[in-house]
Amino acid sequence: MNKLLLSWAASTATPVLLLAAAAAPIFMAGCATFAADGGFDKVADLTRERVGVAPVWHRVPGDSVTAEVRSRIDELLGQPLSADASVELALLSNRGLQARFARLGVAEADRVRAGRLANPRVSFGHLRGGGVTEIDRSVMFDLLGLLTLPVASAVAAQRLEEAQYQAALAAVGVAAEAREAFFGAVAAREQVRYGEQVVESADVASELAQRMQQAGNLNKLDRMREHAFHAEAVAGLARARHRSVAARERLTRALGLGEQLSFELPERLPDLPQTALEPRDAERTAVERRLDVRLARLAAEATARSLGLTRATRFVNVLEAGYVNSSETGAPRRDGYEIELELPLFDFGATRAARAEALYLQAFHRTAAVATEARSQVRESYSAYRMAWDLARHYRDEIVPLRRRISEETLLRYNGMLVSVFELLADSREQVIGVTAYIEALRDFWIADSRLQTVLAAGPATAAVPGTAALPVTDAGPATSAAPYVDSAALFESAVAGRARAH
């Protein structure tokens, strides 16, 4: 792009122009300053509305946190964790989330920079020859930047708001991950306990089968079957223990814990709620409240403002003015002003305008796509939630009680010498397997419940999040007995004792 430099020497009105040019950047420089909170207060409010707890931004590098935050972390870790405590811990100590918060500082700096004029340019020239010395001085200011300052500041402010919504979305995501990891860790621990019961039962059956074969009361094939089941139960328990370790480590990562690994989990998952949620206007609520939908709208609005700025500066992209002073040996000093602008001889700004229009069109369609996906995700998530609740209730009200009654009937038949001890042990194993399936169904329900809340409040359900206004939160409360505890060894011993009394 060619540039045309126009200079005039003016003997009058120069002081006025100089004063105006010098005063403008000084005045405008005070219009944009850094906020005391760095833009974080809005992030805290958005997160609190959806999670129930506000995050904390550790703005001091290093491992140090405030004494108040450290005290709260120690307090939460000093008692068995709950879903809500896991969420609060994650918002206090997750370092990945702190890294996302640091992006706010970048956006805040860009906003302040956009609200200030570019620094003036000063030039000094010194020529000497033939006994003559010529000195040129000039000070140049960006007039175009001054004229477009309000629009540029508004665009940067919207970009900061985008960064705030992105940070809040990240905070809700971390809270959701912590909540889901909590339910997974508790369920995995329960499954280990019931897996140990299966191994105990299989161990008793295998040892009894070996003794009965030695006594000639059991054939070799039946004895090997019992032994094979015992071996498979041991292998299954090993896998369950690893899954428990993996689930606990996932929770540790979500909480952002480093050396503090001795946190305690509750014994059981929370009970299944008596009634399922019935959402009203869930799709409309999601479109209005979801952070990703709001973020897409903000991006489209900021792109529209950028498009307006591009159109306004389409033909003149460089416009500078300033004071010029020239002195020469033996001649009076000359004062004037200089204007520098860029002439659109080869590019009339069509490429920049076309690019800005394409970006706006992209943002417009992305916003519509996000809203469409939000509605679909709400319907899908509620279907998963309702299926999980129905399935868990079916296990709670039908399968587990039926297994218990079958076990009681089998014990009566064993005491009446109508079934063998192997049938009694096999039935106890089946009961444990049924209880384990109920634990899995209950875990899946709580995860589905949490993901539904995430879909309604923030964005795609990658994890769980508590507390939204769209649907009442099902209070998990303290962990209570999720399923009956079946002690296979004790059951076998009581059966043998009952058999002895019968004789």
Tell me the role of every PLM-derived stretch.
Residues 2-18:
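Bacterial N-terminal signal peptides that target proteins for export
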Residues 3, 32, 149, 165-285, ...:
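Periplasmic alpha-helical coiled-coil/stalk elements that build and connect Gram-negative outer-membrane
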Residues 31-56, 88-145, 244, 248-260, ...:
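A small-residue-enriched
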Residues 59-89:
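Regulatory alphaC helix of protein kinase catalytic domains
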Residues 101, 157, 220-229, 421-429:
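Short, charged, amphipathic alpha-helical segments
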Residues 219, 374, 381, 417-420:
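Alpha-helical heptad-repeat coiled-coil segments that mediate oligomerization/polymerization in large
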Residues 232-259, 366, 402-458:
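Short segments within alpha-helical structural elements
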